[in-house]
From Swiss-Prot:
Pfam families recorded: Defensin_beta_2
Source organism per UniProt: Rattus norvegicus
Cellular component GO terms held in the UniProt record: extracellular region
Family named by the database record: Belongs to the beta-defensin family.
Function of the molecule: Has antibacterial activity.
Protein name from the UniProt record: Beta-defensin 12
Coiled coil: none
Signal peptide interval: 1-27
Name of encoding gene: Defb12
Subcellular localization: Secreted
Entries under InterPro entries matching the protein: Beta_defensin_dom
Disulphide connectivity of cysteines: C46-C73, C53-C67, C57-C74
Keywords: Antibiotic, Antimicrobial, Defensin, Disulfide bond, Secreted, Signal
One BP term from GO: innate immune response
Domain of life (superkingdom): Eukaryota
Length: 78
């Protein structure tokens, strides 16, 4: 009986270890953003959270600077 109980506890521990492993993602890092303005924010407007880094700005926005990787820092027009 001791062998089956030990096997049960081993299987239970193995189950909890497997459940805690991330499921193909980088443990939620794909949703984290480095700066409040966007994922690749480097210009001051985006760094302060007043703009968003996008490939193309919307019609209601203007370009306020450049971010990394061909992204523009877009800010609402006043």
């Amino acid at each position: 009986m001791a062998l089956s109980r030990g096997t049960f506890y081993f299987g239970l521990a193995l189950f909890f270890i497997v459940v805690e492993l991330p499921s193909g993602s980088w443990a939620g890092l794909e949703y984290s953003q480095s700066f409040p303005g966007g994922e690749f924010a480097v210009c001051e407007t985006c760094r302060l959270g007043r703009g968003k880094c996008r490939r193309t700005c919307l019609d209601s926005e203007k370009i306020a600077g450049k971010c990394k990787l061909n992204f523009f820092c877009c800010r609402e027009r006043i």
